[in-house]
Amino acid sequence: MTMKKKAIKKNPIKKTSPLKKEDSTLIKTITKKKTTVKKKYEKISTGIKNLDKITEKGFVKSSINMIVGGAGTGKSIFAIQFLIEGLRKGETCLYISFEEKKEEVYSNMLRLGWDMEKYENQGKFFFLEYTPEKVKTMLDEGGGEIETLVLTKNIARISVDSITACTSLFAKETEKRNAILSLLELLRKWTSTVLLTCEKNPSIEKKTSSILEFEVDSIITLYSLRIKDKREKFLEVFKMRGTKHSTEIYPFSIEKKGIDLKCKSCKRLPSIK
């Protein structure tokens, strides 16, 4: 017995969309734009030639970087040298000091051949002396006058000296942590490339270093060690996100033109942890 197959007509079901035609077109356009946007990965010079060589051409643009070291290791010189590199390239730069006076910084840097007053008169360099009280006001205002300056003058590089002095106003651990996080959030919003100096001190380290080490994009540590009858300075790239960097420890000296890193004489020092 054979069965007749009945022809079944397939009635196509019309699919309806809650989106209007113009909405659909708009979404396609936005999606297309998103797929074509590529995140730029740029590097900028640290201002120290040999440091650029061991960090794939320097700092990542718009990153936050921290220089850690004890007294006399060269943190402030590093911070200014980083800005000098930008100034020589025509960039506008900002130095925020929480400790030293403007006259002291200018006098010290002039000995290295860096005429900061000249750049200031050209409208390319700005120096701000900030007390801890002013920092609190700035954080409460969400940026305040510094944000206005950064945005209107198109500041490319910012050095903050030092982040430890910045938090000295806050007594409680939670207040310090919140202040640091708020400051870093502001700095990221401005998209400038930032260099922070941080005092290496056991009492300060316990309170702030763990937060800073996690939040910043790179950490460079400066050491001043007594070896035999004299003190020698060393530099270590402890961390640098998105960069294949050297893990060696290099000696450096402070010369007439700033920090000079000795890449050829790399050393491993068992006393450094």
Where are these regions (language model features)?
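Loop/turn-to-beta-strand initiation segments
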Residues: 92, 154-157, 190-197
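Conserved catalytic-core segment of NTP-binding enzymes
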Residues: 169, 173, 180, 184-190, ...
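Pre-Walker A adenine-sensing motif
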Residues: 48-58
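Intrinsically disordered, polybasic Lys/Arg-rich low-complexity tracts
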Residues: 3-37
